[in-house]
């Protein structure tokens, strides 16, 4: 996301989740003195998640629900009629209710999910979830590349936790996040899809990224279990001598195993290719989707004509909000997700009729909106919202504007029909 960088939110998530786990365990064990440092740190972590991207905060809430349920089970199993048990149970229940409320309440309007639909069958989605393909090459042409070693290590890690009956909630978190991914990738648009995954805009890419977090934890546990088993096997067959060289050799062997596994499971090339494909959209070229070379040419010349206090009428879906960040001129629309200011509605809907509709010029002159910028929206972003701006897009051909600076089809215009 340009406004909210989703990956930054996901990068903060592991620390926020770890802080929640430490805080809850401190409460359960009655180590309240630790809360003086844990709670402020946790609040900062959660605020950081929310600022980076709101759906990262929702992701934290979803991820820790199985952990909180496990902690409630532990409190119930070890129940003692004591104040500490009552406090611990109450705090965990409150935290669980908060997580559900965060998932239910922090979500954009339904229109924000219009872009994302189901892209595969349920069976294919489950297969991709288990084998960590997760559309890793979709940016380059819908090619599924399963990671068999990663899948094996993850399933081995899950089996190891089940065998040891330890931290089973991690498996549940992995399955829960995977279930949300399957919904976003395979379930048709409807009330159920909107209920379950609209906090992520029903965007399967966001949830594909999220699946990796519990998957990596499980695969790390699986790799650790394998290395541990290999070391035990080797040690059992070595002479029992008190020689530190054995330990050193085994540590080196362990490091080699880990590095080899990392080499075979890394998706460096896939990440490189996807990053390269996305980076092309941010280059200033004639065909660039975000800001083309013609649009940038117009933006750079706007300060030569538009005074600091004037406002430029614009359609926020066409890239024109970059005018504000790049050359510091005010606009009628700074971001397509912001609510349209009602006072500008006559301009949006009827600028083309400025010669015959006095309401248009009244708004133009009262608010110093003497300019209009015309850019392109080549991918037709926000198709449902474009009718809000029909009056401006048609004004170019209606004789109510005077071109001030143009480059190709892009241009800055003076709303000359409203000049006294």
Language model features with spans:
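Membrane-embedded transmembrane-helix bundle of lipid-linked glycan/lipid transferases
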Residues: 1-278, 325, 367, 371-374, ...
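Extracytoplasmic
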Residues: 263-420
């Amino acid at each position: 996301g340009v406004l909210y960088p989703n990956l930054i939110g996901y990068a903060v998530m592991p620390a926020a989740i770890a802080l929640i786990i430490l805080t809850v365990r401190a409460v359960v064990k009655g180590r309240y003195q630790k809360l003086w440092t844990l709670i402020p740190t946790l609040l900062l972590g959660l605020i950081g998640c929310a600022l980076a991207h709101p759906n990262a905060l929702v992701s934290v809430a979803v991820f820790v629900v199985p952990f909180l349920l496990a902690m409630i089970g532990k409190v119930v199993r070890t129940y003692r009629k004591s104040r500490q048990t009552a406090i611990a149970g109450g705090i965990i229940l409150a935290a669980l209710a908060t997580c559900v409320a965060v998932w239910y309440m922090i979500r954009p309007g339904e229109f924000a999910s219009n872009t994302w639909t189901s892209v595969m069958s349920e069976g294919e989605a489950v297969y991709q979830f288990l084998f960590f393909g997760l559309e890793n090459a979709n940016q380059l042409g819908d090619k599924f590349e399963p990671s068999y070693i990663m899948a094996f290590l993850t399933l081995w890690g899950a089996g190891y936790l089940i065998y040891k009956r330890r931290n089973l909630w991690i498996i549940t978190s992995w399955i829960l996040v995977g279930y949300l991914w399957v919904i976003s990738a395979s379930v048709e648009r409807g009330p159920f899809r909107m209920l379950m995954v609209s906090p992520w805009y029903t965007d399967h890419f966001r949830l594909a990224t999220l699946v990796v977090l519990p998957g990596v934890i499980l695969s790390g546990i699986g790799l650790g279990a394998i290395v541990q088993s290999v070391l035990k096997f080797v040690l059992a067959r070595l002479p029992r001598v008190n020689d530190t060289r054995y330990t050193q050799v085994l540590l080196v062997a362990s490091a080699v195993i880990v590095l080899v596994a990392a080499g075979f499971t890394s998706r460096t090339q896939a990440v490189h290719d996807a990053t390269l494909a996305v980076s092309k959209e941010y280059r200033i070229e004639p065909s660039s989707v975000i800001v083309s070379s013609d649009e940038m040419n117009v933006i750079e010349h706007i300060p030569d004509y538009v005074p600091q206090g004037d406002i430029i009428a614009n359609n926020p879906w066409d890239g024109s909000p970059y005018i504000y960040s790049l050359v510091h001129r005010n606009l009628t629309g700074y971001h397509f997700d912001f609510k349209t200011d009602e006072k500008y509605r006559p301009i949006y809907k009827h600028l083309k009729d400025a010669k015959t509709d006095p309401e248009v010029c009244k708004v133009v002159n009262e608010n110093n909106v003497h300019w209009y910028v015309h850019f392109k929206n080549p991918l037709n972003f926000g198709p449902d919202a474009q009718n809000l701006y029909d009056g401006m897009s048609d004004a170019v051909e209606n004789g109510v504007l005077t071109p001030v600076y143009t480059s190709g089809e892009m241009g800055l215009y003076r709303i000359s029909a409203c000049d006294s």
